Amino acid sequence: KRLLAEMDTPVMLMPIDDFGTQDIETLYHHTYHRQGNEEILSSILPDLNAVAVFAINKDLKLVIDDHFNDIRLQPLMQSVWTHLYRRSYAGPRRKLYAYFHDKRMEVFSFQQNRFRFSNSYEVTNEHDALYFLLYIWKLTGMDTEKDELYLVGGLPYQEWLLKKAKEHLKFCRVLD
């Protein structure tokens, strides 16, 4: 039996070059508050020259290990990152992606085969989402006339957010 499980837990990204030299459990513990009943796992993202470090509940891991022979565990965002990374090569403009799911917004961009920016935000309304996106846009030095913003995933306030973002950014699109 085979299993691919995508874990919706906080993810710490680190350069692949630093992966073998760091104590990932200690780094993860300092980055995120842990419950104590977690096993720290990692998933290598070779195209992005990064490693995703994440946690799984030890009891859940035990059940999975007991019932499946071929197990692959990865962060929920890994397939999204991979898909949008490949898409980021289309066109000359830099791209900022915002992926919406479960009242969360995952914002990331790529540059030179690496993550340029990646962070996760809890967004309970459209105003929070717009504020975070415009702040990140400014923080990362993106150009309002040249670069692109892509909104992806389940946006409950898609029309409003797209309209307001276009008031500030020339290129803003929704990806299905």
Where are these regions (language model features)?
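Accessory, usually C-terminal, subdomains that scaffold auxiliary metal cofactors
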Residues: 116, 120-176
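Gly/Thr-rich phosphate-binding beta-strand-loop-beta motif of the actin/hexokinase/Hsp70
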Residues: 87-114
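A short secondary-structure junction signal
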Residues: 64, 108-110, 118-120
